[in-house]
């Protein structure tokens, strides 16, 4: 995965470039995109992604997409491991974990299609970690798992507002 994203000449376009431009502008003290006619003023859900990129740009420089691409791969691996861990805690039958791993191979086109962070992979990954953490809390009864679930839930919602759906699922679970 890392070799693919590092060798892929993909650069953000459309909404992606607007979200990263918002982060770079904010780092320079220009908040024009927050106005009612600005990009983030019209698309409020992009604030979280802009904050994520603002942190990445603060560490690695404006419009440096390489760290974002590497994080994309790390979050995919984290999502796969969290899902596997969730199944390991909730079932003793290995067939479910085997089927899960085979089904996760179906996500490879998503990785190839999106070698760049746009919030989807982050929210999926941290949503999976949240399910694992809640399940681990039920299994081990250690408060650190609930703290982890709360932290990753907050980050997941920050990246993508539709992650609220997962939070309702956890509440029902």
Language model: regions and residue ranges:
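Membrane-interface alpha helices of multi-pass inner-membrane proteins
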Residues: 145-160, 170-172
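Transmembrane-helix signature of polytopic, membrane-embedded enzymes
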Residues: 67, 80-106, 124
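Perimembrane helix-loop-helix junctions
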Residues: 139, 166-173
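Extracytoplasmic catalytic/substrate-binding loops of multi-pass membrane glycan-assembly enzymes
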Residues: 8-22, 28-52, 59-66
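Short helix- or helix-capping micro-motifs
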Residues: 99-108, 132, 153, 157
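Short acidic/glycine- and proline-prone juxtamembrane loop motifs at membrane-interface regions
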Residues: 112-123
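Transmembrane alpha-helices of multi-pass, membrane-embedded glycan-processing enzymes
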Residues: 44-45, 49, 53-61, 68-83, ...
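Membrane-interface transmembrane helices that cradle and orient dolichyl/undecaprenyl
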Residues: 88-91, 130-145
């Amino acid at each position: 995965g890392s070799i693919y994203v590092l060798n892929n000449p993909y650069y953000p376009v459309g909404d992606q470039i607007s979200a990263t431009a918002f982060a770079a502008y904010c780092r320079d003290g220009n908040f024009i995109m927050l106005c009612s006619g600005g990009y983030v003023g019209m698309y409020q859900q992009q604030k979280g992604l802009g904050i994520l990129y603002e942190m990445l740009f603060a560490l690695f420089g404006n419009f440096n997409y390489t760290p974002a691409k590497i994080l994309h791969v790390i979050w995919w691996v984290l999502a796969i491991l969290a899902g596997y861990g969730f199944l390991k805690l909730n079932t003793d039958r290995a067939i479910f974990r085997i089927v899960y791993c085979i089904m996760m191979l179906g996500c490879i086109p998503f990785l190839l299609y999106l070698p760049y962070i746009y919030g989807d992979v982050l929210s999926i990954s941290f949503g999976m970690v949240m399910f694992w953490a809640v399940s681990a809390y039920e299994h081990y009864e250690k408060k650190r798992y609930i703290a982890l679930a709360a932290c990753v839930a907050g980050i997941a919602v920050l990246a993508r507002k539709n992650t609220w759906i997962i939070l309702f699922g956890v509440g029902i679970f």
